[in-house]
Amino acid sequence: MNDIIINKIATIKRCIKRIQQVYGDGSQFKQDFTLQDSVILNLQRCCEACIDIANHINRQQQLGIPQSSRDSFTLLAQNNLITQPLSDNLKKMVGLRNIAVHDYQELNLDIVVHVVQHHLEDFEQFIDVIKAE
């Protein structure tokens, strides 16, 4: 594992920790715009770091050239570096990131809550798989 991947993993871990710290029990999330911004920004950062890692591995191992951020995870799954379910979940995160970054549509806070409560472990699972390589 090289410094690029090590640094990206550190970013993901830091962002997950920050999300967990600021989100707390979630009782204030829908009323607190600053809290929403913090959680969404850190989800974006997690997603970007995962994309960067995937692109780096795709390039290093010459797995192909992704045509989109989602394709980065597809290539990893096609080459059995991550599972298809993990690839699918990370591709959904890219969709959430795209909505948050580009304002394609209003971000549904219920989806953000669901991600925080049920899918932060997708980032952790991705880290574990990458570290095992």
From Swiss-Prot:
UniProt effect for mutating residue 94 to G: Loss of toxicity
Enzyme Commission no: 3.1.-.-
Protein name: mRNA nuclease HepT
Motif RX(4)HXY motif, chain ranges: 97-104
Family listed: Belongs to the HepT RNase toxin family.
Keyword field contains Hydrolase: yes
Keyword Translocase: no
GO cellular component: toxin-antitoxin complex
Entry's Gene Ontology molecular function annotations: endonuclease activity; nucleotide binding; RNA nuclease activity
InterPro entries reported for this sequence: HepT-like, HepT-like_sf, Type_VII_TA_RNase
SUPFAM superfamilies registered for this protein in UniProt: Nucleotidyltransferase substrate binding subunit/domain (SSF81593)
Source species taxonomy: Bacteria, Pseudomonadati, Pseudomonadota, Gammaproteobacteria, Alteromonadales
Gene label: hepT
Organism: Shewanella oneidensis (strain ATCC 700550 / JCM 31522 / CIP 106686 / LMG 19005 / NCIMB 14063 / MR-1)
Stated consequence of mutating residue 15 to R: Loss of toxicity
Keywords linked to the UniProt accession: Endonuclease, Hydrolase, Nuclease, Nucleotide-binding, Phosphoprotein, Toxin-antitoxin system
Outcome when changing residue 56 to P: Loss of toxicity
Post-translational modification remark: Tri-AMPylated by cognate antitoxin MntA on Tyr-104; this rotates the residue nearly 180 degrees. Modified protein has much less RNase activity.
Result, substituting residue 102 to A: Loss of toxicity
Positions carrying O-tri-AMP-tyrosine: 104
